[in-house]
Amino acid sequence: MIEYRTVDSPIGLLTLAGRDPVLTNLRMVDQTYEPSRTGWTENPRAFAGAVEQLGAYFAGELTEFDIELDLRGSEFQRRVWRALQTIPYGETRSYGEIAEQIGAPGAARAVGLANGHNPIAIVVPCHRVIGASGKLTGYGGGLDRKQTLLALERRHSPASLTLFD
């Protein structure tokens, strides 16, 4: 049985879903693609650990999630999503760089499609992928949220801290 929980965050309402504690879905409530909730059961106490980690992330206190995930997609999509998880907090990569990383040079557009189908936003950091020119491009939650997440990470990134911070 799939359980879900909706929580508030600095970027709006987030819905977490899966078989607690294993997360299969994390989306912004008003995101462009919303999965069917047929057969889902609301449980306001589910995913307590994930919610706690998200709170720490938004407070700038957590740079790496430790949440059990069940990523379902094609083999190519899962390769892309695993590559996204290697992008360090506070950094970005281009679609082309991800394509190279997974051994599919020239597949930047396919990487973009896989990135757009990422079922677990924020934890699988699809917001860290940008265009080759450095421009912010597509994000299911909206470019304003993508910019907010990247700014949050830059502000709290270990690389941005100095000895006197």
UniProtKB/Swiss-Prot annotation:
Cross-referenced Pfam families: DNA_binding_1, Methyltransf_1N
InterPro entries assigned to the protein according to its UniProt record, in alphabetical order: MethylDNA_cys_MeTrfase_AS, MethylDNA_cys_MeTrfase_DNA-bd, MethylDNA_cys_MeTrfase_DNAb, MethylG_MeTrfase_N, MGMT, MGMT_N_sf, WH-like_DNA-bd_sf
Superkingdom as given in the UniProt entry: Bacteria
Biological role: Involved in the cellular defense against the biological effects of O6-methylguanine (O6-MeG) and O4-methylthymine (O4-MeT) in DNA. Repairs the methylated nucleobase in DNA by stoichiometrically transferring the methyl group to a cysteine residue in the enzyme. This is a suicide reaction: the enzyme is irreversibly inactivated.
Active-site residues (renumbered): 126
Enzyme class, spelled out: transferase
Cellular component GO terms, alphabetical: cytoplasm
Compartments (UniProt record): Cytoplasm
Provenance organism: Mycolicibacterium paratuberculosis (strain ATCC BAA-968 / K-10)
Gene name, Swiss-Prot/TrEMBL: ogt
Single GO molecular function: methylated-DNA-[protein]-cysteine S-methyltransferase activity
Similarity comment: Belongs to the MGMT family.
Protein name per UniProt: Methylated-DNA--protein-cysteine methyltransferase
One GO term of the biological process aspect: methylation
E.C. no: 2.1.1.63
Key words, A-Z: Cytoplasm, DNA damage, DNA repair, Methyltransferase, Transferase
Reaction catalysis annotation: a 6-O-methyl-2'-deoxyguanosine in DNA + L-cysteinyl-[protein] = S-methyl-L-cysteinyl-[protein] + a 2'-deoxyguanosine in DNA; a 4-O-methyl-thymidine in DNA + L-cysteinyl-[protein] = a thymidine in DNA + S-methyl-L-cysteinyl-[protein]
Misc. comment: This enzyme catalyzes only one turnover and therefore is not strictly catalytic. According to one definition, an enzyme is a biocatalyst that acts repeatedly and over many reaction cycles.
